Amino acid sequence: PASAVPRWVSEGLATWYESELTDAGRVRGTYHDMVLRTAALEGRFESIGQAAGGSPQWPEGTRAYAYGSLFFEHLLDKYGDERMDQFIEAVAGQWIPYRLDAAGRSSFGVSLSDEWAAWADQARSEAEGLDSELASLGAISAPERLTNNARWGLHPKVSTDGSALVYVRSNAKSDQQLVLANADGSEERTL
């Protein structure tokens, strides 16, 4: 499709095809499902207009890939894989590539805005059902924060005696840092 489409379309298509044409890919993984499930449970499932935007808040740059690829997966599960070629041709054939609802109607028989809203409702319902099912199995452990001033705490390793934790801290403001802390996250120092 044209380069003027929202990022969730271009990146969502690329990510969907990555999975469709290989035995791997992010649509086959669980991370994107988790991103959308978390958003649904927290009341933050993004609208079709929000999914293309950038934000420093989680899931940051992942949103276009996660929302786009799983929305296309939803559309094709519901309306058939053969509709993807029709959608791409419909978008590519437009003088004004922003008319995604028209492309959706001509290829899937529905406007993408309406189908997105239905998909969001379905995602909320499924997430709430899974949440209830898991809660019925017993209490879920609450997470314990071990890092401070970090957007990401990556590659954690615990010392052999269990007293120390070392990890890579990324705060998106400065270079990544190697941090050594007590196993409970206290007394951090940068190495």
Predicted regions located by residue number:
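Acidic/His/Gly-enriched intrinsically disordered linker/tail segments
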Residues: 1-140
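A short loop-to-beta-strand structural motif that recurs across blades of beta-propeller domains
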Residues: 177-179
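Multi-bladed beta-propeller domains
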Residues: 126-152, 181-191
